[in-house]
Design a protein with these regions (language model features):
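Nucleotide-activated sugar donor-binding and catalytic core shared by glycosyltransferases
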Residues: 1-453
Length: 453
C-alpha cells in the first residue's frame, strides 16, 4: 500500500516522522510519498519532497504575500496525488492548505481514503466547517479529548489518539536542576515568527538585566539558520570591545532604579562580546558562535546565548520561560517550566483573526484548563515592561510558581500519555481495511481504553 503525506510545518514533520515509523512497524511493506520536512524525508526516501522551509508561514498576511507560491504547490500536490493514486492521503495539521486539498481530492475521487491527523482547530474559528469536513474526510485523528465531542453529531468519524508530543518529550527527559538565574527564550520555529517576537524578548531581557545583572538568557533555535538570524538580531544590542579582545562586561549602577537607568541610558544595558570564555554554569551544549561576557562578579555566560536543538533541555533547566504561542507552550507545560506566552503577528493577520477566532485564550495549556494558567501577552499587549514584570513574579513568588506547575500537571494528564503515534497508525490501517466513506454515520472513538475522556 502507498500513503501520500502532506505536512507543512516543523512540528508536523516531527509528528509525521513518528507516525511513519509506527506504520512501518505494523506494516514494513508500506510505501510513503508526498511532502513534508527532513525527518519525514529521511524515512520515506529521496522521492519525498522537503518543502518545510518555504511552506511554514505564520498568518494571513504572510500567506497572501506568498499566494503565487502556494497556488503552484497546491497544483503540484494535486497532480502528484492524481498520478500516484495512493491508497490513502494523510494530511497533518496545516489546515489552510490541507482542508482545501481534501475537498479538491474528494471532488475528483482519485483516492481511497483521506485521513486528517491532528485535527484542524475549526472549533476555534469556524465550527460550522465540521459538517462540511464530513463530506470529504474519512477519518480525523484527534490529539485533544474535547475535539471528538465536537465531531460526534457531524457524521465525521473521529478517534482520540492522544498527543504525539508526549512520546517525543518522554525520551528527552534529563537529570538536571532549575537554575534560578536562567531564563529561557522560545521565539518560535518560523523565520517570520522570530522576526516579530524575538525583538520583544530581547527588550524584556534588557529590562530584567537592568534589575538583576546576574541573570542569564538562553534562546532555543530550531535550526542553525534560525540561530544565525537570531545572532544578527542580537548583535545591535552588543557593544564590541575597543581592543577586540575576548573580555566584556554588563555595565550597571548598583543603586540605580529601573526608571532612573531607563532615563539616563535610554533603556540600554551595555553588553560586550567575549567569544572564548568558559563557565561551569552553562550545562547545555550551545551552538557555534557562542559568546560570553564577563560580569561584575567574575566570569558569567553571555546574557543571551543561542542553542540549536536544545529546547527540551532548556525547558528543564530554565527557572522561567518566555514562549511564543504554539506547540512550545504545551512542551513547557509538560516539562513543568513556568512561563509567560507571547503572540505577535502582522496587523492584518491579527485583525482578521479577531473577526473569526472564538476562544477565550490562545495558549493551548490555558484552553485545556479553561483559565489563564500562563499569562498571555497578545499583539499590542506584548510589551517588554509588562512581560518583564510577569517574569519577575514567577521568579520571586514561589506560590505562583507552584500553582502554575500544579495546573500544568493536570493539563498534561488529559493528553493520553505515550503511544499516540502507535494508536494513530493502528487507526489508519483499520480505516483502510474497513472501507468506510465520507457521509456514513460517524461517531466518537478512542483508540485505547486508557483514554481520559
Amino acid at each position: 500500500m502507498t500513503i501520500y503525506f502532506v505536512a507543512g510545518e516543523v512540528s508536523a514533520d516531527n509528528h509525521g516522522a513518528a507516525l511513519m515509523r509506527s506504520l512501518r512497524r505494523l506494516d514494513p511493506e508500506l510505501k510513503f510519498i508526498g511532502r513534508g520536512g527532513p525527518q519525514m524525508q529521511q524515512i520515506a526516501g529521496a522521492q519525498f519532497k522537503n518543502w518545510i522551509g518555504d511552506a511554514a508561514v505564520l498568518g494571513l498576511w504572510e500567506v497572501l504575500r506568498k499566494y503565487g507560491y502556494f497556488r503552484e504547490q497546491f497544483r503540484q500536490t494535486l497532480s502528484e496525488i492524481q498520478e500516484s493514486k495512493p491508497d490513502a492521503v494523510v494530511l497533518i495539521d496545516y489546515p489552510g492548505f490541507n482542508l482545501r486539498l481534501a475537498r479538491a481530492l474528494r471532488r475528483q475521487s482519485q483516492i481511497q481514503k483521506t485521513i486528517y491527523y491532528i485535527s484542524p482547530q475549526v472549533w476555534a474559528w469556524n465550527r460550522g466547517r465540521i459538517k462540511k469536513m464530513a463530506r470529504f474526510i474519512d477519518l480525523v485523528l484527534c490529539i485533544f479529548p474535547f475535539e471528538t465531542d465536537l465531531y460526534a453529531a457531524s457524521g465525521l468519524h473521529a478517534v482520540f489518539v492522544g498527543h504525539p508530543m508526549i512520546e517525543r518529550l518522554e525520551t528527552q527527559k534529563i537529570e538536571t536542576y532549575r537554575d534560578q538565574n536562567l531564563i529561557g527564550l522560545f521565539p518560535g520555529s518560523r523565520s517570520r515568527e522570530v522576526r516579530k517576537i524575538f525583538p520583544v524578548m530581547i527588550e524584556a531581557a534588557r529590562r530584567l538585566l537592568q534589575l538583576n545583572p546576574t541573570l542569564r538568557f538562553q534562546v532555543a533555535a530550531a535550526s542553525e539558520q534560525l540561530a544565525d538570524q537570531m545572532r544578527k538580531m542580537v548583535a545591535p544590542h552588543l557593544d564590541p570591545l575597543p581592543s577586540g579582545r575576548g573580555e566584556a562586561k554588563v555595565e550597571t549602577e548598583p543603586n540605580e532604579s529601573l526608571d532612573q537607568r531607563s532615563a539616563s541610558s535610554k533603556g540600554k544595558v551595555k553588553m560586550q562580546v567575549a567569544p572564548n570564555e568558559s563557565s561551569h554554569q552553562a550545562p547545555l551544549p550551545l551552538s557555534r558562535g557562542e559568546e560570553r561576557v564577563r560580569g561584575p562578579k567574575g566570569p558569567l555566560p553571555h546574557p543571551i546565548e543561542i542553542a540549536v536543538g536544545q529546547t527540551a533541555a532548556m525547558m528543564q533547566h530554565a527557572f522561567v520561560g518566555i514562549v511564543a504561542s504554539g506547540t512550545a507552550a504545551l512542551e513547557a507545560a509538560y516539562f513543568g517550566m513556568p512561563f509567560v506566552l507571547i503572540y505577535k503577528v502582522a496587523w492584518p493577520t491579527y485583525v482578521a483573526a479577531r473577526l473569526v477566532v472564538n476562544v477565550d485564550f490562545l495558549g493551548m495549556p490555558n484552553l485545556l484548563a479553561a483559565k489563564e494558567v500562563a499569562p498571555e501577552f497578545i499583539q499590542h499587549e506584548a510589551k517588554p515592561d509588562a512581560i518583564a514584570k510577569a517574569v519577575r513574579l514567577l521568579m520571586e513568588d514561589s506560590l505562583a510558581r507552584h500553582r502554575m506547575i500544579s495546573d500544568f500537571d493536570a493539563i498534561i494528564s488529559k493528553l493520553g500519555g505515550t503511544g499516540a503515534s502507535e494508536r494513530s497508525a493502528q487507526a489508519i490501517l483499520e480505516e483502510l481495511k474497513e472501507g468506510r466513506s465520507p457521509g456514513r454515520p460517524g461517531g466518537v472513538e478512542t483508540a485505547a481504553p486508557w483514554s481520559t475522556r
